[in-house]
């Protein structure tokens, strides 16, 4: 029945136009064409003469010409026609308007939508006549035309709307209505709307929406209308509402000047864009091409659910609607029906693919077309590990240093003026003793004070005053730079000293210690991300795409698009964190732009997608507890480097006890440190002399250096170093060496055109000194390195551990997202990506933890030994240094097997220095295993998995960047093929392109016997060093891949190893790219290439890594906790009553209903898997910190906290034997939606975990905010003991949340138990254990499930450690099998204690109160929540 009959052909109008599929060879690359010269009947006769070999599904487009011929429609139809079995027919406007529906050409699928002038009645009649498959329901389009019906449907679906009322007027008697108008309000049907409010016509076709302002704001109204030129609204002084017509009156939502437009394609895909609100000023912002400026935004999890609900409720597959984000909530204010995204090639690809698959899935069975939805790599992200096995990628964690920056500069001065103290108090400096000022208004206040003091000091001359005047002048000049405050490139830090600053690092000689308190003012400027740094970050982001699966097939488009499509769904859980430094945040934004193929400026990307981690210590280094250790190290370092004698054996032992190769090489270059410092100082003097001479040259008057620097600023930079490096005593300030190296490296790279003499020698000597000073400042011995490192990055280590452990907790994901099965093997799987952008200190520290913390025994692990040797040869962790942890899951292994989860550790030293090839080549990896050597070999290579399709187009952003051809070496044989899965061989194909060569993210080095060249492999790009892939212990078979995909393999040839070793490993940055006008980086100097990732180890298990991280955190928790407690106690005595750590004040809102974690949300059903897009990072596990919703089906905030706390126990202390227990959840693909997920845990793991919790030394607190902070990574010791604070203030404790009662109760319970233990020590294990369980049940009034919620239960009732004998604690894990025997007795005992001391009702009321406080705190304070919310935790 697929063919058209002759009668139907004769009846069709001659004005209908046909789009034919890509099967026609003459239609060119676009795949479609429009026949306008022939009549339709002739066309059909031709088709009948050439009976098509295959059935065709005809897709009819029924819309007004303006819509059906629009650019988005044309782009999507072009792509739709690439489906072999689809033929697209466009009904002409004349046919639609003038022909009866019986004469309209028949079709099997109809895409029809209403717009101005469209006869919707005829379209409905046609659909009844032909009964086609409707993409957008036609009857519901009547409702979409009436805003009253739209709001009614939205309300019925439980979707949040602004508060509104409908005013219906009878046209005959418009004065008869329920409207009472006041000066600053209107009352509609009894509902009062104070100004500002919005007045909307009930007809959706009427775009004359008015917003009325209150008289206090000047009154009048803003009149919105459909865009006319560059205007979308005008202001009117008229303040009275309209007197004729029916309207909807609704509350005005303050949206910070932006509207969010959401575009769905089916219930499972949504794209969101933000635009300037037309209500702001009415001016439409347009780009250079005249298009309205929009930028992609990320939708929160709840907003994605709204998109699905809107799509389903209105039965519109393609549907657009408007979101207002205000007050931490999102509201739907309009549903537009059929609507496309404009100017997004990625959206066009995805839209056509989804529509085509939808049509084929619905209609293909009727025509016996052999078709099924292809299982793609983004459905199951199975990729090759570097060891060659095929596994599912589950988690990518990357810690990345910021990009190239301008030299950092710093000035310190002591201030005692009352105005500075007033400023310090105004911004809350006394709460912590420190204050950081970055915002423009804050810097303006500092500048105002500085100007005032300078005016006063002019009247008081004197030597001391002159020095202070000089510093104030410098402070003033720096703050006045650029003529504006960006808040990114300058900051002022104030530190309170109760007895004055004891010493000044600036070399000031204070005659006596001032008795009065003073403030140390530290001004920092410079350190801005350069255009080169932006290019580096953006390009590295593009390269990172290639670590992710997908992107193969006809819709690949460009390298890495698999990640983009993955990210457009629920399946990519991406969060990007950055410290509060401007260069770090801009690096993160540029990286996100490249990673997600975003467009536009970095600022909106930064605002939308990069989370600041500066409030929790996650990525910033303000740890004071380790300053003593660092001072000792620096003092010893300075002492050694101040010796005017060649290095002797003792110096080598003292300075390089770890035997680092790079350190020994630098020391051999230095020989005598003082003599080298003399040379460096002389070269700096010569340099400043050359700059002064150049400034006298008239031709250099207007000379502009890199990044708009002038010769004056350059001289100022070097003169300060010249003054500070050699002190008055003649000794050298070793701490200035990194700054000197920083400056000369910057000038050699960016200002080489000046031709200054001696810079190369200065670079060589300062680098040698810096290569000693910088790494050794983080510790000289192994123990010092680990101690200092953990002090810097303990919160980050905990966060990494949490990230790794929560990857298999799919159940918590399901609670927030409709992950419906699409028939794939594992529909709900996610790739969890966490990117942490930070500064050099954290990268050094984290690497030190892995190198010296005892991850593996290098004497027993040859691969780790080679990795340590490679790291030892790295002299500098340059810009864009990366430490990448990748977690894979082997679904063929037993869930409890240690081989189930596979961890790889990768590293890159960042951008290449000015000395090309200064970093060592990667060492390559072939895990030495007798099993590997004995196995039969099989030809194949990972890299041959990258087929180059002629039809694939290169990355559009990289088309202008020609790359040199690089031969990619491939091993001839690769043994031990295992774990290969059907349909999983398309990995890394997103890296193929039509370019002759590409950026390879893995460098090459291989024995000559294993080298061969392949036409496929040579066109691959890759993120990792081919050393890893070539030396892998196993790899998929290339022949199998070619056989599966029908590809012909080109002949292979040998390529000598040396040719590969000396080809630059990475050639992705080029002058042509940097200077191309479309890339916006004109004036960039040569951007250095980045070293590829080298695999440090590719055979780690998750248990190994988890135990290692837990051990490192545990080892340093106690001492750190004591130091922090002492610091807090001392500061608490001086703090005001509004202590920042006190519990949140009680707010009033209905308490949230707790739901058990295994319960499925009410909307969970068995539809297709969700693929909702948000063009920006989305969290499939949590709600965005800035958006909390009141939808009827949302999970409670407390539920989310419980889920977060499940992983928290893994961050804390381990049982007596130091081995944590892990609860691995099985995949839920076989369960019904109503069934709770099956949790499998080792026998006794529940009991071990609970006992573990009772023995932990963790602050005793109920306050949920503490738990949130702890999960983010704040060290336990840095969060004060809330119970102790509240005990000091009994009124606060009684009136707020009374957290101490539960703690006291638990103590009494344990005292009772310990008394029993003395009589019967064998039962002590059971008693302590089970009381915890029963107490948790009674306090929380819900059962404690095995292996899942024990952490949060005990966390909230406190953990008294002093009452538990150490010996029984150690024996708990050995006797877990006997614990259930005494359950009833313990239950009765604990019940008696509860009844005696405190009724359980009171405890449960406290719990409800806390839940209420947390939910309201989150709703009321979105700024704080942005830092502390669950989304930030995940």
Curated annotation (Swiss-Prot):
Reaction catalysis annotation: 1D-myo-inositol hexakisphosphate + ATP = 1-diphospho-1D-myo-inositol 2,3,4,5,6-pentakisphosphate + ADP; 5-diphospho-1D-myo-inositol 1,2,3,4,6-pentakisphosphate + ATP + H(+) = 1,5-bis(diphospho)-1D-myo-inositol 2,3,4,6-tetrakisphosphate + ADP
Top class in the EC scheme: transferase
Positions of region (Polyphosphoinositide-binding domain): 384-455
E.C. code: 2.7.4.24
Keywords associated with the record: ATP-binding, Cell membrane, Cytoplasm, Kinase, Membrane, Nucleotide-binding, Phosphoprotein, Transferase
Subcellular location field: Cytoplasm, Cytosol; Cell membrane
Organism: Rattus norvegicus
Name of this chain's protein: Inositol hexakisphosphate and diphosphoinositol-pentakisphosphate kinase 1
Gene Ontology annotations for the cellular component aspect, listed alphabetically: cytosol; plasma membrane
Record: residues binding substrate: 66-67, 226-227, 261, 275, 339-342
Pfam families referenced in this protein's UniProt entry, alphabetically: His_Phos_2, PPIP5K2_N
């Amino acid at each position: 029945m697929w063919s058209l009959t002759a009668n139907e052909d004769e009846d069709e109008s001659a004005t209908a136009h046909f789009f034919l599929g890509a099967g026609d060879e003459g239609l060119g690359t676009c795949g479609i064409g429009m026949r306008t010269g022939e009549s339709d009947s002739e066309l059909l006769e031709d088709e009948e003469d050439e009976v098509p070999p295959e059935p065709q599904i005809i897709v009819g487009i029924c819309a007004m010409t303006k819509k059906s011929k629009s650019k988005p429609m044309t782009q999507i139809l072009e792509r739709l026609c690439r489906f072999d079995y689809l033929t697209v027919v466009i009904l002409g406007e004349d046919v639609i308007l003038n022909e009866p529906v019986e004469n309209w050409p028949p079709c099997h699928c109809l895409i029809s939508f209403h717009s101005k002038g469209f006869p919707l009645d005829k379209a409905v009649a046609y659909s009844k006549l032909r009964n086609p498959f409707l993409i957008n329901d036609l009857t519901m389009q009547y409702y979409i035309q009436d805003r009253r019906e739209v709001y009614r449907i939205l309300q019925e679906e439980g979707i949040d709307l602004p508060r509104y009322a409908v005013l219906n007027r009878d046209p005959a008697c418009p004065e008869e209505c329920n409207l009472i108008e006041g000066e600053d309000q209107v009352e509609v049907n009894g509902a009062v709307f104070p100004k500002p409010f919005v007045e909307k016509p009930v007809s959706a076709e009427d775009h004359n929406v008015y917003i009325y302002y209150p008289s206090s704001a000047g009154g009048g109204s803003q009149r919105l209308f459909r865009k006319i030129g560059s205007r979308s609204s005008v202001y009117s002084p008229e303040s009275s509402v309209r007197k004729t017509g029916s309207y909807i009156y609704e509350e005005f939502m303050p949206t910070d000047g932006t509207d969010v437009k959401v575009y769905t394609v089916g219930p499972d895909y949504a794209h969101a864009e933000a635009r300037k609100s037309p209500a702001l000023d009415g001016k439409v912002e347009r780009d250079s091409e005249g298009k309205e400026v929009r930028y992609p935004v990320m939708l929160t999890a709840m907003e994605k659910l709204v998109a699905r609900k809107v799509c389903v409720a209105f039965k519109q597959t393609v549907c657009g609607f408007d979101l207002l984000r205000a007050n931490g909530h999102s509201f739907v204010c309009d549903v537009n029906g059929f609507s496309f995204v404009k100017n997004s090639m990625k959206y066009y690809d995805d839209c056509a693919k989804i529509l085509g698959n939808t049509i084929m899935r619905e209609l293909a069975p009727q025509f016996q077309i052999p078709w099924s939805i292809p299982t793609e790599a983004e459905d199951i992200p199975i990729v090759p590990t570097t060891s060659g096995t095929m596994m599912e990628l589950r988690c990518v964690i990357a810690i990345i240093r910021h990009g190239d920056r301008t030299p950092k500069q710093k000035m310190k001065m002591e201030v005692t003026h009352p105005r500075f103290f007033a400023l310090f108090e105004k911004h809350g400096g006394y709460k912590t003793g420190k204050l950081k000022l970055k915002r423009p208004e804050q810097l303006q206040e500092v500048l105002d004070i500085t100007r005032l003091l300078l005016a006063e000091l002019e009247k008081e001359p004197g030597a001391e005053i002159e020095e202070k005047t000089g510093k104030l002048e410098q402070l003033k000049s720096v703050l006045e730079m650029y003529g504006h405050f960006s808040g990114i490139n300058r900051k002022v830090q104030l530190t309170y000293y109760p007895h004055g600053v004891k010493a000044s690092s600036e070399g000031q000689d204070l005659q006596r210690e001032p008795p009065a308190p003073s403030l140390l003012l530290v001004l920092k400027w410079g350190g801005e991300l350069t255009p080169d740094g932006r290019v580096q970050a953006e390009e590295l982001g593009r390269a990172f795409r290639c670590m992710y699966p997908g992107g193969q097939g006809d819709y690949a488009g460009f390298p890495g698009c698999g990640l983009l499509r993955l990210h457009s769904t629920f399946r990519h859980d991406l969060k990007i964190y950055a410290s509060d430094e401007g260069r770090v945040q801009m690096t993160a934004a540029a990286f996100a732009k490249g990673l997600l193929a975003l467009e536009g400026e970095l600022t909106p990307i930064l605002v939308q997608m990069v989370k600041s981690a500066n409030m929790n210590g996650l990525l910033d280094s303000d740890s004071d507890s380790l300053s003593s250790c660092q001072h000792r190290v620096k003092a010893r370092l300075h002492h050694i480097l101040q010796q005017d004698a060649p290095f002797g054996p003792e110096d080598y032992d003292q300075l390089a006890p770890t035997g680092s190769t790079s350190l020994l090489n630098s020391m051999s270059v230095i020989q005598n440190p003082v003599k080298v410092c003399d040379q460096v100082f002389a070269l700096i003097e010569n340099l400043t002399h050359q700059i002064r001479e150049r400034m006298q040259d008239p031709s250099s008057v207007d000379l502009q250096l890199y990044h708009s620097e002038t010769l004056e600023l350059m001289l100022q930079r070097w003169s300060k170093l010249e003054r500070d490096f050699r002190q008055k005593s003649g000794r050298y300030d070793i701490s200035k060496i990194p700054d000197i190296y920083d400056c000369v490296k910057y000038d050699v790279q960016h200002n080489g055109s000046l031709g200054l003499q001696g810079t190369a020698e200065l670079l060589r000597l300062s680098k040698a000194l810096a290569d000693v000073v910088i790494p050794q400042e983080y510790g000289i011995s192994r123990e010092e390195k680990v101690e200092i490192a953990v002090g810097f990055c303990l919160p980050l280590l905990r966060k990494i551990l949490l990230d790794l452990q929560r990857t298999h907790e799919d159940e918590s994901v399901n609670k927030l997202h409709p992950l419906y099965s699409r028939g794939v093997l594992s529909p709900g799987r996610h790739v969890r990506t966490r990117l942490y952008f930070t500064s050099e200190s954290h990268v050094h520290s984290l690497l030190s933890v892995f190198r010296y913390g005892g991850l593996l025994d290098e004497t027993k692990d040859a691969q780790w030994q080679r990795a340590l040797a490679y790291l030892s040869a790295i002299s500098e962790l340059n810009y864009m240094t990366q430490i990448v942890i990748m977690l894979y899951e082997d679904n063929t292994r037993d869930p409890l097997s240690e081989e189930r989860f596979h961890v790889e550790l990768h590293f890159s030293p960042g951008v290449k220095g000015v000395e090309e090839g200064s970093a060592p080549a990667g060492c390559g990896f072939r895990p030495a295993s007798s099993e590997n050597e004995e196995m039969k070999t099989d030809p194949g290579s990972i890299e041959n998995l990258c087929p180059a399709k002629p039809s694939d187009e290169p990355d559009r952003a990289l088309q202008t960047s020609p790359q040199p051809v690089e031969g990619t070496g491939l091993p001839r044989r690769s043994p031990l093929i295992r774990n290969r899965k059907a349909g999983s061989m398309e990995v890394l194909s997103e890296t193929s392109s039509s370019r002759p060569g590409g950026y390879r993210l893995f460098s090459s080095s291989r024995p000559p016997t294993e080298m061969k060249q392949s036409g496929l492999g040579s066109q691959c790009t890759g993120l990792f060093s081919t050393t890893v892939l070539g030396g892998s212990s196993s790899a998929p078979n290339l022949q199998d891949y070619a056989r599966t995909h029908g590809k012909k393999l080109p002949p292979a040839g040998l390529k000598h190893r040396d040719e590969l070793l000396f080809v630059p490993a990475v050639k992705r940055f080029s002058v042509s790219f940097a200077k191309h006008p479309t890339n916006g980086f004109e004036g960039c100097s040569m951007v250095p290439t980045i070293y590829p990732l080298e695999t440090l180890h590719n055979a780690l298990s998750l248990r190994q890594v988890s135990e290692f991280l837990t051990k490192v955190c545990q080892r340093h928790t106690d001492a750190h906790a004591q130091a922090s407690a002492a610091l807090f106690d001392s500061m608490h005595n001086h703090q005001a009553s509004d202590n920042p750590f006190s519990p949140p004040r009680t707010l009033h809102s209905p308490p949230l209903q707790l739901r058990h974690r295994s319960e499925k949300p009410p909307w969970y059903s068995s539809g297709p898997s969700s693929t909702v897009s948000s063009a920006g990072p989305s969290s499939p596990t949590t709600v965005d910190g800035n958006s909390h919703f009141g939808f009827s089906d949302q999970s409670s905030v407390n539920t989310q906290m419980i889920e977060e706390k499940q992983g928290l126990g893994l961050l804390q202390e381990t049982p007596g034997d130091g081995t944590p227990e892990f609860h691995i959840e099985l995949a839920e693909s076989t369960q019904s939606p109503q069934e709770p997920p099956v949790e499998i845990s080792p026998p006794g793991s529940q009991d071990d975990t609970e006992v573990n919790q009772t023995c932990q030394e963790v602050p005793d607190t109920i306050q949920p905010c503490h738990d949130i902070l702890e999960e983010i990574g704040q060290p336990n010791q840095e969060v004060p003991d809330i119970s102790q604070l509240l005990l000091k203030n009994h009124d606060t404790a009684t009136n707020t949340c009374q957290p101490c009662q539960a703690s006291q109760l638990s103590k009494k319970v344990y005292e009772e138990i310990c008394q029993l233990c003395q009589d019967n020590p064998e039962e002590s294990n059971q008693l302590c254990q089970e009381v915890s369980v029963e107490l948790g049940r009674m306090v929380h009034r819900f059962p404690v499930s095995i292996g899942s919620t024990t952490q949060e239960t005990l966390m909230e009732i406190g953990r008294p450690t002093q009452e538990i004998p150490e010996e029984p604690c150690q024996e708990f894990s050995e006797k877990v099998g006997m614990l259930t025997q005494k359950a009833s007795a313990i239950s009765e005992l604990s019940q008696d204690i509860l009844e005696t001391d405190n009724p359980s009702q009171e405890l449960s009321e406290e719990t409800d109160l806390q839940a209420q406080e947390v939910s309201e705190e989150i709703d009321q304070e979105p700024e704080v929540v942005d830092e502390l919310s669950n989304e930030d935790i995940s």
